[in-house]
């Protein structure tokens, strides 16, 4: 491949697909990111907290076979870092939203439970959030991405 074509390929390359993937829906900038274990989730938390703007969060946790049905790893994640003035709201969603809400309660962080992911996203956008982070585990990634792409 000639160098001029290679530069164009690099410019057009989009490695996202759920890795800090960005959507713009109405007046809301949405970032979708995969978090499937404690190390990955803690990296997500660091990325979210580096953004000093006000933001809302949706955390989607499933326990399908591909995710692994043992979600005890959630207790190894440093969710207490979300106790910051820049976090306007946290919504928990997905099959294991009750467990995620309990986990947030243990670090004294209030969260709203909306089991249906699409409803959760629509509600946050309707509430006027300007910046929305959607953190999902593996089996929630593709369906959530489709929801966001269809709203985009």
Language model segments and positions:
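Active-site beta-alpha connecting loops in nucleotide-dependent enzymes
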Residues: 16, 28, 34-113, 151
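Short loop/turn motifs at secondary-structure junctions
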Residues: 2, 53-54, 86, 128-130
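Generic C-terminus detector
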Residues: 98-106, 110-152
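Gly/charged, well-structured mid-domain segments that form the phosphate/adenylate-handling core
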Residues: 1-31, 35
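Residues at or immediately preceding the N-termini of alpha-helices
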Residues: 3, 38, 117-118
